[in-house]
């Protein structure tokens, strides 16, 4: 029991600090801090499994985080039809060129035992594939980025609900982790740290500079979100009635109808921000709880005991 007392004390202190922020500053700020803590908890769980239990140094967490952000765009944003018509075919051809390159490289690795033939074959596939990709991708990318560059200039996504992007982000991060594991897990600790850091920087650099994919460092306008917008809540009658009922004592003390209406409007504005943040808190907390349960199950499984 004693080993848990420090953990309970630490969480209790943090909870008290967040409550103090809400009491003396703003509940909106307090919930923002709590939401950032929950997001950080998700990344911390992953780092704890890798580094804490398995002893595998990973400095590439930002690469996986960047893929999560990319997944939001690729899954939830509506497709940009003009961009697809301008250069979408070139991008699809490039995708299949990459697939053929991977298949050919696997073929050379599996069926060519002689080192010289295998090396020259793989080198030919890589160099030829890069040249084909360059010739095919460049005109397509230029055409896509020229489509209304102030607002779009990228292919868009699948137009699905934004919660699906959380699942998509997990699959993208898992795919990158599989590739990193195949390449770098045999390295010594310090080399593994350097390799993971470099791979993360490569991922971040690609996302930043390939504007046709997700607009790079530019903003993507109109991203969907799993919670209602504050402005919609402020005009919803059910929400106004709820806020009015919650603050009925304070409002009853105001005699002037105009002042009472102004006070109610301010209460509605403040409450809408808190309500939206509470929605995100519920979603983030659900994810953290599910991950804690899954990771605990994994930790006490044969795979976890081996770590």
Describe each PLM feature range:
Residues 1-306:
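Transmembrane alpha-helices and adjacent helix-loop boundaries
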């Amino acid at each position: 029991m004693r080993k848990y007392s420090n953990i309970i004390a630490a969480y209790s202190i943090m909870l008290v600090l967040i409550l103090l922020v809400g009491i003396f500053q703003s509940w909106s700020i307090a919930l923002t801090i709590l939401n950032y803590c929950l997001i950080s908890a998700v990344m911390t769980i992953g780092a704890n499994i890798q580094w804490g239990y398995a002893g595998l140094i990973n400095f590439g967490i930002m690469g996986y985080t960047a893929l999560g952000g990319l997944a939001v765009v690729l899954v939830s944003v509506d497709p940009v039809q003009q961009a697809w018509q301008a250069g979408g075919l070139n991008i699809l051809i490039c995708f299949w060129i990459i697939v053929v390159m991977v298949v050919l490289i696997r073929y050379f690795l599996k069926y060519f035992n002689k080192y010289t033939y295998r090396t020259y074959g793989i080198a030919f596939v890589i160099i030829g594939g890069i040249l084909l990709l360059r010739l095919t991708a460049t005109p397509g990318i230029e055409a896509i980025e020229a489509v209304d560059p102030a607002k779009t200039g990228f292919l868009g996504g699948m137009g699905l609900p934004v919660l699906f992007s959380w699942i998509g982000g997990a699959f993208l991060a898992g795919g990158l982790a599989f590739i990193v594991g195949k390449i770098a897990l045999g390295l010594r600790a310090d080399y593994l740290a350097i390799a993971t850091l470099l791979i993360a920087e490569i991922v971040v650099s690609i996302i930043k500079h390939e504007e046709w994919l997700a607009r790079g460092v530019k903003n993507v306008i109109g991203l969907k979100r799993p919670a209602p917008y504050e402005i919609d809540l402020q005009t919803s009658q059910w929400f106004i009635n709820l806020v009015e009922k919650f603050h009925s004592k304070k409002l009853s003390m105001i005699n002037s109808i105009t002042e009472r209406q102004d006070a109610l409007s301010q209460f509605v504005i403040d409450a809408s921000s808190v309500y939206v943040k509470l929605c995100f808190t519920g979603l983030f907390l659900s994810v953290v709880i599910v991950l804690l349960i899954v990771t605990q199950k994994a930790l006490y499984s044969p795979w976890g005991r081996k770590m």
